[in-house]
Amino acid sequence: MPPLPELFANNRRWADDQRARDPDFFARLASQQQPRYMWIGCSDSRVPANEIIGLPPGEVFVHRNIANVVVHSDLNCLSVLQFAIDVLHVKDVIICGHYGCAGVRAALSEDRAGLSDNWLMHVRDVARTHRRLIERLPALPARQNRLAELNVLSQLANVCHTTVVRDAWARGQEVCVHGWIYDVHDGLLRDLGVEISAHETLMPAVESAFARMEASVPG
């Protein structure tokens, strides 16, 4: 890991490079933020939101936690979601999980992870609910990847069930919720094919995604 003084030097170079490319960048950024996107992702250091979608500061409003979980009792996450939708008026909310997620791996195993076990119970609940879809896959890495995908769909549904999103839809605000997965092995995002812009479309879209997963397993 770089020593701390080097981080300040890196920051100076980054700021100088930004000003060289766009002299008004920081003045414009300081005046206000108008992100179109909200990103709910994993805290994993290999999955930095802005970098993997190629957007500069000011374009994405980000909330991250272990295994990209959305819980209706988590005031941290709900406050970020409410600010993004009600104040910033973001149009797209992206729930992005990733393959190789340590939280998902721990949730699928019987190993204890300490305090975070309590948090990962939410992911273990997803694994129990969809055990058949997971256990149809013979190899452990494939099962872990499948749980990462199922977890995204579950958290997407949780977002859509929040009063924040449902109230926005009720007043006619344009909000679309997306489920994506990121592969740390090749750096590519994959769309899980679920985009929800009205509450009544949620369950049909999620059930269709489950059916596609079922059909993707031979035999």
Predicted segment positions?
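Gly/Ser/Thr-rich loops at beta-strand to alpha-helix junctions
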Residues: 44-46, 98-103
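N-terminal short beta-loop-beta anion/metal-coordinating cradle
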Residues: 18-59
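Short beta-strand segments
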Residues: 40-42, 64, 94-98, 178-183
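Divalent-metal-activated hydrolytic enzyme cores
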Residues: 1-35, 67-91, 102-219
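Glycine/charged-rich beta-loop-alpha catalytic/anionic-binding loops adjacent to active sites
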Residues: 57-68
